[in-house]
From Swiss-Prot:
Organism per entry: Homo sapiens
Cellular component terms (Gene Ontology): extracellular exosome; I band; stress fiber; Z disc
GO molecular function, one term: structural constituent of muscle
Name of this chain's protein: Nebulette
Domain of life per record: Eukaryota
Residue ranges with Acidic residues bias: 9-24
Gene3D superfamilies listed in its UniProt record: SH3 Domains
Region: Disordered, residue numbers: 1-24
Modified residues (Omega-N-methylarginine): 795
Protein encoded by which gene: NEBL
Length: 1014
């Protein structure tokens, strides 16, 4: 291990030597200090003081530091620190040893001369030893370990020079199945061909339990909705019969004006091309492109003269004519630019006052895409603090989805073992059923290719002639880079700013031709100077380029099949010789149709142990691989299973690939091999390196970040294409729903994050934000809801007849639920109306110490009424005690109350929860009256002092507050959570009367806010 301190120490010693050589004549040797008792005492005191200060600093910094457990990295740092401290200690010891007593003596002539001679001799000996040992290092004699050998081989494979050399070497093909180039071509074709992958998946997985699943059907519908082609087809079908009877865009004058504006916009665009981003093209500088460019230059003069002769007699129309202005106004109203402006105004975004150039718009969009602050603001506004009510985001739903995936994999493997392997079947390509399936898939794929050719290639203006793939690619790239952007610039730069364009003049045509030739030349020049010369990599992931690549592949496959059919008709059938069988096997392995089947099926030789092992591994990881291929389009990282499989395949097959390459048998160059070779030459090293970077777990280095930023800033076509595709249609609710569903479908990311976070606690501060998050999580959690749902599932409910007791319980439940969940208290509205109801209501009551005992006017009436009420109350207590002792506890409360109310009409029953009458509460029957007209009871009170006189009763209950409550009226009391309420007396179903022990206040309080304390 290299310790950087050694170099520092060496530098320090060298500096000391240089300083000593410079100051040898000026040195003064001091006398050593004699160590006596005072020096020893001072040394010990210094050590004690330093120890005390160290402990004080340790105590002060104790609260500022966080102690963590010893991780491997921390132990490594400790060991390095120990080595560094030991090296420094040895360095100081050597420096002290060099200052010996002999050296402190005065320098004499002999000592100085001896020192110089010794130094010269040491330098000469050092140089001789260095020259003798030059070229003999320890590394040259060491054996090369396997790790170093493997690292060197990986480095060679990753280098660009070695890669190109290996590409040339692998152009000789053999009949082996596991060659790296064949596997890479197969993998890339599968990744690019999404439609073929889905078709192959549908052919292989024919189980109704897999195909008919709701999530699969939902994913298919989501892909159809998100497809722009399907959206345009649906729009055309719906709007076919809704066109306007008069379309000003189809008039001759408007078309002429539009053509002139297009040509003028081309001139304007080419004129300002130096002020904007330099255009970038990923087309290679091929010989036939140069030939085409030179030919176009030679023909441009002739074409220019021909068009000049044809346009001699044409006249120019007036741009300010009434008809032209009318068409221009209609075009502005119908244009997409107007809709976008109205959409931006409706969104509330202010329009900038200065002119927005295309370069400024591209820079602004790039800043928005790269800005992390915008994402955080959207997160704060839209997500943070809002409770999620979607069922798809609950932990239970994610867990169920994860278990479903596991069960599906298990079921798939189980069916494979039971139906195929368990019945002794061999997956051989020569079985009649497999041959028939192959033939059917070939016919279906051929039909699909023709359909794609008609709809994608011919329907979009491309010519499916005998041109090569490079020519088609160049044509498509030219269309993308010119027509689409020029038309958009026409709408935004010229028409939107009220500019008037002249007609199709001679100068405009000449400028158009010259700009086209200059643009092609400028693109190639910028490509060589700006991109290739600076080591930048051209991105192949542009949607337009991907679509062009897809088109070229479809056409190449169709052309290949046509050539194969022509070749079949030119040959006669002969007996298969070993050479022909070997060539057939090679063609089957290279064929694109064979890639859609399982790798290894249809071999004409006996399977070796290595091939059987590869087959079993592919069968075991097939279900995971298919799912992971879908996830290549998502923004999530590779799961651990896929990473492990990739690493295993790389580690296992490195040596095997080389051996198979050496065992390759050269064959003649067939048309299939020629086509494969051309396709491999077109696949650049950028694609492979990009895939390697996506597979590594390191962050992007500064050079890669700079290259990415430069690519984004330089590529003007890319930004314009992205902006155009992002604003061609408005965001419909279906599109938003599809986006949300696609984000919610993938549960692998959430489960992986959950597994990684499991068992890794971290100490964080208990901030108010964290408390808020905890409370929100507790409220959002539906675990309790699902638990209760599972308990009551299938039990059903028994309908009962509504009686007064059930009605009262239902209303109480409604009050409690409103108060607990919604924060709505229905009794507040009734309390606001209570003072008006209580006015002028008088109820006769008396108690010891009541004011009524001193009133001479009402004494007789009060005495008679209270005497009758007291007799009824005593009789009621005796009757209830006898009925309670003779009956069981299960008697309904509604029946008891009905009987009591029939016998004693003047009594009013209280809540069954408190039962104050059986405990002898001092509430007389006439003290309160209950009204059931509105479902809530009203308390008619006449004297507060008479209520306070009842606090001395020894049998009153004590309650504790469960929530905070603020008094809404004068006769109510306020309390907090945890307060004790004494002398509680029930009034009706929803209200009680009591005294708060903490404040000493007495008044009414809600019954659902307190709980009984034994």
């Amino acid at each position: 291990m290299r310790v950087p301190v050694f170099e520092d120490i060496k530098d320090e010693t060298e500096e000391e030597k240089i300083g000593e050589e410079e100051n040898e004549e000026d040195q003064v040797f001091y006398k050593p200090v004699i160590e006596d008792l005072s020096m020893e005492l001072a040394r010990k005191c210094t050590e004690l003081i330093s120890d005390i200060r160290y402990k004080e600093e340790f105590k002060k910094s104790k609260d500022k530091c966080t102690f963590v457990t010893d991780s491997p990295m921390l132990n490594h740092v400790k060991n390095i620190g120990a080595f560094i401290s030991e090296a420094k200690y040895k360095g100081t010891i050597k420096a002290d040893l060099s200052n010996s007593l002999y050296k402190r003596m005065p320098a004499t002539i002999d000592s100085v001369f001896a020192g110089e001679v010794t130094q010269l001799q040491s330098e000469v000996a050092y140089k001789q030893k260095h020259d003798a040992a030059k070229g003999f290092s320890d590394y040259a004699h060491m054996k090369e370990p396997p790790e170093v050998k493997h690292a060197m081989e990986v480095n060679k494979h990753q280098s660009n020079i070695s890669y190109r050399k290996d590409v040339q070497d692998t152009h000789t093909y053999s009949a082996e199945l596991d060659r790296p180039d064949i596997k890479m071509a197969t993998q890339i074709s599968k990744i690019i061909s999404n439609a073929e992958y889905k078709k192959g998946q549908g052919i292989m997985n024919k189980e109704p339990a897999v195909i008919g699943r709701p999530d699969f059907e939902h994913a298919v519908e989501a892909s159809k909705l998100s497809s722009q082609i399907k959206y345009k087809e649906k729009f055309d079908n719906e709007m076919k019969d809704k066109k306007h009877h008069y379309n000003p865009l189809e008039s001759a004058s408007f078309r002429q004006n539009q053509l002139a504006a297009t040509l003028a916009s081309n001139v304007k665009y080419k004129k300002d091309i130096q002020n904007m981003h330099d255009p970038v093209s990923d087309l290679p500088n091929l010989l036939f492109l140069d030939h085409v460019l030179k030919a176009s230059k030679m023909l441009s003069g002739r074409e220019y003269k021909k068009l000049f002769e044809e346009n001699k007699g044409m006249y120019h129309f007036d741009a300010d004519a009434v008809e032209h202005l009318h068409h221009k106004g209609n075009a502005v109203l119908q244009s997409q630019v107007k809709y976008k402006e109205e959409y931006e105004k409706n969104k509330g975004k202010p329009m900038l006052e200065f002119v927005e150039t295309p370069s400024y718009q591209a820079s602004k969009e790039a800043q928005k895409m790269q800005s992390e602050k915008v994402y955080k603001e959207d997160f704060e506004k839209e997500i943070k603090g809002r409770s999620s009510l979607d069922l798809d985001k609950t932990p239970e739903f994610l867990h169920v989805k994860y278990i479903t995936n596991l069960l599906r994999e298990k079921e798939y493997k189980k069916d494979l073992e039971n139906e195929i392997k368990g019945k002794g079947m061999e997956l051989n390509s020569e079985v009649l059923d497999i041959q028939r399936a192959k033939r059917a898939s070939e016919m279906a794929s051929e039909k699909e290719y023709k359909k794609d050719l008609e709809s994608i290639i011919k329907g979009k203006g491309m010519q499916a002639g005998t041109d090569t793939l490079e020519m088609q690619h160049a044509k498509k790239a030219a269309e993308i880079a010119s027509e689409k952007d020029y038309k958009r610039d026409l709408e935004t730069e010229i028409k939107g700013k009220g500019m008037q364009v002249s007609t199709d003049t001679l100068d405009v045509q000449r400028a158009k031709k010259a700009s086209e030739m200059a643009s092609q030349k400028q693109y190639k020049k910028d490509l060589e100077n700006e991109i290739k010369g600076k080591g930048m990599q051209v991105s192949m992931d542009i949607p337009d380029i991907l679509r062009a690549k897809r088109t070229s592949e479809i056409y190449s496959q169709r052309k290949y099949k046509d050539e194969a059919e022509k070749m079949l008709s030119n040959y006669s059938t002969i007996a298969d010789t070993p050479e022909i069988q070997r060539i057939k096997t090679t063609q089957q392995n290279i064929s694109a149709v064979f890639y859609k089947k399982e790798v290894g099926a249809g071999t004409a030789v006996k399977d070796s142990p290595e091939i059987e092992r590869v087959k079993k591994n592919q069968q075991n990881i097939s279900s995971v691989k298919y799912k992971e291929e879908i996830k290549h389009a998502t923004a999530i990282s590779d799961p651990p299973e896929l990473k492990r499989v990739k690493e295993n395949q790389k580690n296992i097959s490195n040596l095997q690939y080389k051996e198979q390459n050496y065992k390759a048998t050269p064959v003649s160059m067939t048309p299939e091999i020629e086509r494969v070779r051309r396709n491999q030459e077109q696949l650049s090293a950028v694609k492979y390196k990009g895939e390697l970077q996506r597979g590594t777990a390191i962050s992007d280095p500064p050079e890669l970040k700079r290259a990415k930023e430069n690519q984004k800033n330089i590529s003007n076509v890319y930004y314009r294409g992205q902006l155009g595709r992002a604003t061609t249609l408005s965001v419909t609710p279906e599109m938003e729903r599809v986006k949300k569903n696609q984000e919610n479908i993938s549960s692998v990311k959430y489960t992986q994050d959950h597994k990684q976070m499991k068992g890794r606690p971290s100490l964080i501060l208990d901030t108010p934000a964290m408390r808020h998050v905890k409370e929100a999580q507790n409220h959002i959690s539906m675990v309790k809801y699902h638990e209760d749902f599972e308990k009551t599932k299938g039990r059903g409910f028994t309908p009962v007849v509504d009686d007064p007791v059930t009605e009262r319980v239902r209303k109480n439940t409604q009050v409690v639920s409103d108060a607990a969940y919604k924060g709505v208290h229905p009794h507040i509205v009734e309390m606001d109306r209570r003072p008006g109801i209580i006015v002028d209501l008088k109820v006769w009551r008396t108690d010891p110490g009541s004011i009524f005992d001193l009133d001479p006017l009402e004494d007789n009436i009060q005495s008679r009424s209270l005497h009758m009420l007291s007799e009824k109350a005593s009789h009621y207590r005796r009757h209830w005690s006898r009925s309670h002792s003779s009956s069981t506890f299960g008697t309904g409360l509604g029946d008891d109350r009905s009987e009591i109310s029939e016998i004693y009409p003047s009594f009013s029953c209280c809540s069954e929860v408190t039962r104050p009458s059986d405990e002898g509460a001092p509430v007389l029957p006439g003290a309160y009256q209950q009204s059931h007209s509105q479902g809530y009871g009203y308390m008619h009170q006449t004297s507060v002092s008479s209520m306070r006189s009842m606090q001395h009763s020894p049998n009153l209950r004590t309650y504790r507050a469960m929530y905070d409550y603020s008094a809404q009226d004068e006769d109510e009391v306020s309390f907090r959570d945890g307060d004790y309420i004494v002398n509680v007396q029930p009034i009706d179903d929803g209200w009680m009367y009591g005294t708060v022990q903490r404040t000493g206040r007495t008044g009414m309080l809600p019954a659902n806010y307190i709980e009984f304390v034994n």
